[in-house]
UniProtKB/Swiss-Prot annotation:
GO biological process: terpenoid biosynthetic process
GO MF: heme binding; iron ion binding; monooxygenase activity; oxidoreductase activity, acting on paired donors, with incorporation or reduction of molecular oxygen
Binding positions for heme per the UniProt entry: C418
Source species taxonomy: Eukaryota, Fungi, Dikarya, Ascomycota, Pezizomycotina
Keyword Iron on entry: yes
Originating species: Aspergillus oryzae (strain ATCC 42149 / RIB 40)
Identification of the protein by name: Cytochrome P450 monooxygenase astB
EC number: 1.-.-.-
Amino acid sequence: MGLILAFAVILLSTCWFLWYSRKAVFDRLPPGPRPLPFLKSRQELRQTRQWEALDDLHRQYGPLVGMTWGGRPAVLIGKREIAKDLFGKRGSIYSSRARLVMGLDIMTGGDHVFFLPYGPKWKKLSRIQATFLNRPAVKHYRPLQELESLHTLQDLLHSDDYEACFSRFQASLTHALAYGTRLHSATDPQLTELENIARTFISAATNSHWMVDSFPILKYVPACLAPWKRFGQQIHAQTVSLFQGKMAVAEHTRSWNWVKHIRALKHTSGVTDHEMVYVIGSIYQAGVGIITATLRLFIMACVLHPEAVKAAQDELDRVVGSDRLPTLNDLGHLPYVEAFVKEVLRWRPLVLAATHSVTQDDDYRGYRIPRHAVILSNQWAMDMDREVWDSPEQFRPDRWMSDRKRMPSAFGLGQRMCAGQYMAMESLLIMASRMLWAFTFEHAWEGGKRVEIDSWAFHEESLFLVPKPYRARIQPRDPHRLHVIQSTWQAAEKDIDPLLDQIGREIHTASA
């Protein structure tokens, strides 16, 4: 009896200590919903229209909201100036990632750049990515981006499956740069395989309900007893097999590509093949889906806001004329077109919140943010902030005209900004400028009735939004522009080996 009593006292004391310690941590967080059930705050966000739930938290508690995320203390940021303070001025301690055991350890073998904590490995792999994704390097990709966008215009003349056309565009561009070969058709089996891998990975890795992320000790449960672990290991094996196969082919192509570029870098002798899989593969996984979804939003904005389309087309007609397609070199003279793309990114943010983690205790605005707390940057709130944006619910490209250097929050802030932001922005700009130059955008009609578009209809995948399918009518602006597209495509050089070799020489010369 005495032993049982002693055990009970120890157990109760331990529970009290854990409760008191946890309460002390949460009492010093910013105001917010306090956790009664262990996972309550995060579960409250698992509902449709999560952006409304996040906005409600800021309306109730202010720009800094204390909450839980997988049982861990978390802070939700709703103001851009606060995010710039923490991720910029205090970036040395706010540039890590919340530990996602499923996404990093199990599904990617500890090497996915996006999920890596701030430290030596992340710095090493990020430096490698920067050698071919920095702003000067990306400018050398313009001829290839123009070829792929021209191909996409040709596809749009014959297909109303815009998602497939846009997916092929960015996938082929990335595939050509990474592995030295293009994807010529939206029905290419390689594209289907890549899309399936990327979609499954993003959906699973960013899922907010893996118990192993809340209880990391579950990582050590044998796979035979854990279906979720077998699932993650299967995705890992499929991803490594797919991308290692592509790397092997890339090393024997005739032209320059990212694989050969990384192999030739002097400081990459210690980089493993497994790390290379994710140095390159993570760019594909993160970029293709977001670019595709953003271009679908672009079409939606064009249909719903014809006055903005007219202003952009007037600018294109003045600068470019009707006898040739716009190029990326024209963009310096197309401020409204650039503003149009930025407004698409702000108008309907596709990333609800980006997750960071703090590596040491910090005091900010009178609150204590504990070490390893999850820091969520609420990009939706920042892009819809009425104190920053006049009538933020309206689509108004002119709001970007006064400061062309200003960038939307879609690419993040601080040291964990999207590594591919420059390439992504140029892809969006070349596609948007050429579609605005070439096409009219109207509602579809069915049975004599106009088919309406709901601009708030999204599929929600954890903290990512994907526009639901909608119908639109896209037609050439006039027969002359149709002829320009077709004749330019017929005359275009389709062999990309000379293009890639030229890119390689220019990047090598610039870095020498």
